[in-house]
């Protein structure tokens, strides 16, 4: 399992417009190969949004990163200061805490 954390700020759109965008695009992520789950994030006070992605493995994450959807996120003028971090999962303790294994 592999975790990816993506954050960004909104520019030129408000929270309601982003929420509509997220709801319209959620089915696209639900059908994405290798994606176990995406948790959508919104810290409205800080103006920071993003997602936590749980991937089957690093290869599935890399396929997403080289694809059209991720490239569109990075090119979207309404999503600025994009940060992307990824982490391999420690399987042993994650199993103990019911982390999806």
Q: What are these model-predicted stretches?
A:
Residues 1-49, 56-66, 77-101:
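Short S/T/G/P-rich N-terminal loop/turn motif that feeds into the first structured element of a domain
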Residues 71-76:
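A common structural junction motif
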């Amino acid at each position: 399992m592999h975790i990816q954390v993506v954050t960004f700020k909104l520019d030129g759109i408000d929270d309601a417009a982003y929420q509509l965008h997220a709801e319209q695009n959620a089915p696209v992520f639900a059908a994405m190969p290798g994606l176990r789950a995406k948790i959508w994030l919104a810290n409205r006070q800080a103006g920071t949004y993003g997602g936590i992605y749980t991937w089957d493995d690093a290869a599935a994450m890399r396929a997403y990163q080289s694809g059209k959807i991720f490239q569109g996120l990075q090119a979207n003028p309404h999503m600025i200061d994009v940060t992307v971090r990824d982490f391999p999962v420690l399987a042993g303790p994650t199993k103990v805490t019911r982390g999806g294994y």
